[in-house]
């Protein structure tokens, strides 16, 4: 009986965590193309976002690394912007299990 309760509790906790992923804020809120330093660090804040894997599909932008912090509500996303990157809305995909959340991040001229 204890094993069943433990299993059920673990399952319910995983469902809560799975359903809770959202993004409240990304800092800085936008960035400029053509900067001297091609590296961009984004601090992503949102409930449960620390469990997510991250991908970027935008010409001239590559994902350098993702750092998970002690708090499950923060992620640091490091991007490399080529000199040729064009201004626009860059989709960043956050994935936990089968759930995907796409947030557009603006690159300005």
Residue ranges and their predicted role:
Residues 20-51, 99-109:
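Beta-strand/beta-sandwich contexts
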Residues 9, 28-30, 92:
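Short non-domain terminal segments
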Residues 16-17, 33, 93-95:
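Residue-identity detector for threonine
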Residues 7-16:
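Bacterial N-terminal signal peptides
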Residues 18-20, 66-67:
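Short amphipathic alpha-helical segments, especially helix-boundary/capping motifs
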Residues 1-4:
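Positively charged n-region of N-terminal signal peptides that target proteins for export
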Residues 37-97:
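Immunoglobulin-like IPT/TIG beta-sandwich domains and homologous Ig-like subdomains
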């Amino acid at each position: 009986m204890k094993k069943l309760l433990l299993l059920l509790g673990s399952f319910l906790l995983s469902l809560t965590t799975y359903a809770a992923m959202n993004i409240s804020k990304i800092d800085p809120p936008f960035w400029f193309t053509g900067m001297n330093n091609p590296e961009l660090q984004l601090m992503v804040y949102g409930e449960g976002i620390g469990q997510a894997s991250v991908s970027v599909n935008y010409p001239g932008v590559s994902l350098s690394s993702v750092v998970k912090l002690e708090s499950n509500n923060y992620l640091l996303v490091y991007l490399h912007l080529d000199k040729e990157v064009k201004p626009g809305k860059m989709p960043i995909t956050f994935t936990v299990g089968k759930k995907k959340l796409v947030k557009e991040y603006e690159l300005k001229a």
